[in-house]
Amino acid sequence: MIVTEILGNVHDDAGAALVGDRHREQVHLEGSALVKRIQRLRTDHGNEYGLRLPAGSPDLRDGDILTVDDDDEGERGNAVIVRVLSTDVLVISARSLREMAFVAHSLGNRHLPAQFFDADGPFGRDAMVVQHDHTVEDFLRAHDVPHERQERVMDVPFRHAEHTH
């Protein structure tokens, strides 16, 4: 079967209602796979699906519903749901705007993708989040910048931006 559209998301009321009490198969994806609109997927039950989303489709998200079906007798069948694997990240919580500017500038020179969160976000504090890299962690330690290594499911995949100098 080729999946050509996302039917909803189980984290939304409409998506949860669509799936209902169907058996849930899961496709476990790393963050880097969330940006690929064409790929082959395998569920935790060994079933294979092709994914071919139209150009301009949004990135996949945790909880996206790929298929729902009913069996031949009209009984509720299966739903195939995207589950995002956790990512090894560094959560950087600078003590001041000056310190955050220093860190962002230094890591920006390495062209690392970063995500920024305010105190109302999932980390409960202002934070810059990057994928774990031992050289970044060494840099943060050397400059006494508060940071924490965590395994997190990121809502938005890290994405490398094209650039030239």
From Swiss-Prot:
Pfam family, one: UreE_C
Broad class of the protein's primary localization: cytoplasm
Known role: Involved in urease metallocenter assembly. Binds nickel. Probably functions as a nickel donor during metallocenter assembly.
GO cellular component, one term: cytoplasm
SUPFAM superfamilies attached to this UniProt entry: Urease metallochaperone UreE, C-terminal domain (SSF69737), Urease metallochaperone UreE, N-terminal domain (SSF69287)
Subcellular location: Cytoplasm
Entry annotated with the keyword Cytoplasm: yes
Matches recorded under InterPro entries: UreE, UreE_C_dom, UreE_N, UreE_N_sf
Family the entry assigns: Belongs to the UreE family.
Protein's GO biological process: protein folding; protein-containing complex assembly; urea metabolic process
Alphabetized UniProt keyword annotations: Chaperone, Cytoplasm, Nickel
Name of the protein this chain belongs to: Urease accessory protein UreE
Lineage: Bacteria, Bacillati, Actinomycetota, Actinomycetes, Micrococcales
Any one GO MF annotation of this record: unfolded protein binding
Coiled-coil residue spans: none
